[in-house]
Design a protein with these regions (language model features):
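Short helix-to-loop capping/linker segments positioned immediately adjacent to catalytic or ligand/cofactor-binding
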Residues: 106-118
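A gly/proline- and charged-residue-enriched helix-loop-helix capping module
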Residues: 91-108
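Conserved small/polar residues in nucleotide/adenosyl-binding loops
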Residues: 137-139
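Short, solvent-exposed loop/turn segments at secondary-structure junctions
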Residues: 72-74, 132-135
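Active-site and ligand/interface coordination hotspots across diverse enzymes
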Residues: 1-92, 116
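A residue-level signal for beta-strand positions that form part of recognition/binding surfaces
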Residues: 124
Length: 139
């Protein structure tokens, strides 16, 4: 099952206890089966290895602030499992450009140079979407 496989990769992190409790709940097996079936039939964003990227990049013990996004970006090569973040080299989507405008208004020009926000996550910013996966059929 796709979610179980990806959650196993969080083994040894401080998110492990939280997800162990969730995995034991009745809904989780149904959710895992649903996401696994969707990924087998459709394009799902982000790629499986990035579904839990927000948790890998920002340990629970390091969380200082949470920035919630709506759902993953749905253009090829954009979704990386961190809300608002796209790989460097990708054009910043409108929502990220708005964040950059606000940062520059507060901190001055040039403070937002990278579209990949992994460094933010490593500094305690949990960049979490309220929906972790999105299939093309829902767009």
């Amino acid at each position: 099952m796709l979610l179980t496989t990806e959650l196993d990769k969080l083994s040894g992190t401080d998110w492990q206890l939280f997800f162990a409790q969730e995995r034991a709940k009745p809904y989780f097996a149904e959710l895992d089966a649903f996401v696994t079936a969707a990924a087998a039939e459709k394009t799902v964003y982000p790629a499986a290895e990035n579904i839990f990227a927000a948790f890998r990049a920002c340990p629970v013990s390091a969380v200082r602030v949470v920035i919630l996004g709506q759902d993953p970006y749905h253009e090829p090569g954009q979704a990386m499992g961190l809300s608002f973040s796209v790989p460097d080299g990708c054009k910043a989507p409108p929502s990220l450009r708005n964040i950059f405008k606000e940062l520059e208004a507060e901190l001055g020009p040039g403070c937002a140079a990278h579209t990949d926000l992994t460094l933010w996550a490593r500094q305690g910013v949990l960049l979490l979407n309220t929906v972790l996966t999105l299939s093309l059929i829902h767009i």
